[in-house]
């Protein structure tokens, strides 16, 4: 742009300096405006890609399954937001979880409404009814990943409820079979992620047993942060299930099929659902305990590494102090030698033992000073755990 402005500016200088200033100022303002506009467009595009909610079309992309587990329409479809709220008896704030950032939210949630159940577990967003299941696309794109394909296949199999050879059909109602498939997939993903974290952490700790360097410590720090994030995610899921099982009225409201038949459950009559939730709660609790054990191992290793590094640092400091003590002792000998070497008259030069006397005096002074300093240093080393100094024999 400067190459285009300079000729114009030269022509403007021939007219007047003020005209050149106005031309340069307007060009700079226009360039700054274009940069601001580009930043705004990029931010809006990122927000649009990160959300399920399309501001222009007011639609949400989802896949619908009927009572037999068949995919309605054969593929995912876009549903209007208002239609989704009115048709399923939702509140506008209920869609907040599926309209957030494209990266899955850490906070799991199960919302029970009069005619449906909203579920948000890890990467799964679903709306479960007594005869319909809606799976929301959290990425805003086609749901063609391997994990999602397996989840859809398992969900369809459970919704069909045809029963395996030699086994009867699942006695659980439609909505509970859908919830069971969601919990199984979420826990399977959580378990797979746990195995990866445990394997990586075990390898990092094993490498530190043979040597400690900067790269290994940096990698352990990064892995410790990942473990903390995973621990928070699994802990929130356990707390969500714990809170859900403590609410008897919510558990009884989750029997959607019986409510549709006009026979709602009593507040205390939810033993089937509670047994299902307790099964998955036990698995989540095991995951939480496993990741807490891994975090404890990392912290123990960090403490041991800090102790080793502190010990090495103390050894280096002691080595430096010993060198300083040796130099101090040698300096005392040099001081005596300097006094003897002065070109002044003294009584020592009159005898034949002057040199030997000065040498012996310097050596004795050096040894005494060195032993005294080393003794004091060793006394400082023998510190008790209570903060006092140990006895030195």
Curated annotation (Swiss-Prot):
Topology relative to the membrane: Multi-pass membrane protein
Residue range covered by the transit peptide: 1-45
Protein's GO biological process: mitochondrial magnesium ion transmembrane transport
Family: Belongs to the CorA metal ion transporter (MIT) (TC 1.A.35) family.
Transmembrane segments: 323-343, 350-370
Cell compartment(s), UniProt: Mitochondrion inner membrane
Pfam families per the UniProt record, alphabetical: MRS2-like (PF22099)
This protein's name: Mitochondrial inner membrane magnesium transporter LPE10
Location of the motif YGMN: 340-343
Subunit architecture: Forms homooligomers. Interacts with MRS2.
Native source organism of the sequence: Eremothecium gossypii (strain ATCC 10895 / CBS 109.51 / FGSC 9923 / NRRL Y-1056) (Yeast)
An example Gene Ontology molecular-function term: magnesium ion transmembrane transporter activity
Keyword terms, alphabetized: Ion transport, Magnesium, Membrane, Mitochondrion, Mitochondrion inner membrane, Transit peptide, Transmembrane, Transmembrane helix, Transport
Entry-linked InterPro entries: MRS2-like
GO cellular component, one term: mitochondrial inner membrane
Protein's UniProt keywords contain Transit peptide: yes
Organismal lineage: Eukaryota, Fungi, Dikarya, Ascomycota, Saccharomycotina
Major subcellular location class: mitochondrion
Function: Mitochondrial inner membrane magnesium transporter required for mitochondrial magnesium homeostasis. Modulates the conductance of the MRS2 channel. Involved in the splicing of mRNA group II introns in mitochondria by affecting mitochondrial magnesium concentrations, which are critical for group II intron splicing.
KW Magnesium (keyword) present: yes
């Amino acid at each position: 742009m400067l190459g285009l402005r300079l000729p114009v500016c030269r022509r403007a200088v021939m007219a007047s300096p003020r005209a050149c200033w106005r031309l340069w100022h307007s060009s700079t303002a226009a360039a700054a405006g274009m940069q601001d506009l580009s930043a705004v467009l990029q931010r809006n595009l990122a927000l649009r890609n990160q959300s399920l909610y399309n501001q222009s079309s007011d639609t949400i992309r989802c896949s619908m399954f009927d009572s037999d587990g068949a995919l309605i329409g054969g593929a995912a479809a876009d549903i209007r937001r208002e239609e989704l709220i009115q048709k399923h008896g939702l509140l506008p704030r209920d869609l907040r979880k599926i309209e957030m950032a494209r990266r899955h939210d850490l906070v799991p949630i199960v919302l029970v409404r009069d005619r449906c159940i909203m579920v948000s577990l890890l990467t799964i967003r679903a709306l479960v009814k007594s005869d319909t299941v809606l799976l929301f696309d959290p990425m805003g794109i086609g749901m063609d990943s391997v994990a999602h394909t397996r989840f859809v296949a398992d969900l369809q199999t459970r919704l069909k409820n045809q029963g395996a050879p030699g086994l009867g059909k699942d006695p659980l109602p439609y909505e509970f079979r859908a919830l069971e498939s969601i919990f199984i997939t979420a826990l399977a993903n959580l378990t797979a992620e746990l195995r990866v974290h445990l394997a990586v952490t075990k390898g990092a700790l094993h490498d530190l047993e043979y040597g400690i360097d900067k790269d290994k410590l940096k990698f352990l720090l990064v892995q410790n942060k990942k473990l903390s994030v995973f621990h928070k995610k699994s802990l929130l899921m356990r707390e969500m299930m714990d809170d859900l099982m403590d609410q008897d009225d919510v558990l009884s409201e989750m029997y959607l099929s019986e409510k549709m038949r006009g026979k709602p459950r009593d507040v205390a009559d939810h033993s089937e659902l509670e047994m299902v939730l307790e099964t998955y709660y036990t698995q989540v609790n095991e995951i939480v305990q496993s990741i807490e054990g891994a975090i404890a191992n990392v912290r123990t290793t960090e403490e041991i590494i800090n102790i080793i590094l502190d010990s090495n640092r103390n050894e280096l400091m002691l080595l430096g102090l010993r060198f300083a003590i040796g130099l101090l002792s040698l300096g005392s000998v040099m001081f005596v030698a300097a006094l003897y070497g002065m070109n002044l008259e003294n009584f020592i030069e009159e005898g034949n033992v002057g040199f030997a006397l000065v040498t012996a005096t310097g050596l004795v002074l050096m040894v005494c000073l060195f032993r005294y300093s080393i003794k004091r240093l060793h006394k400082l080393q023998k510190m008790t755990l209570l903060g006092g100094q140990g006895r030195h024999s």
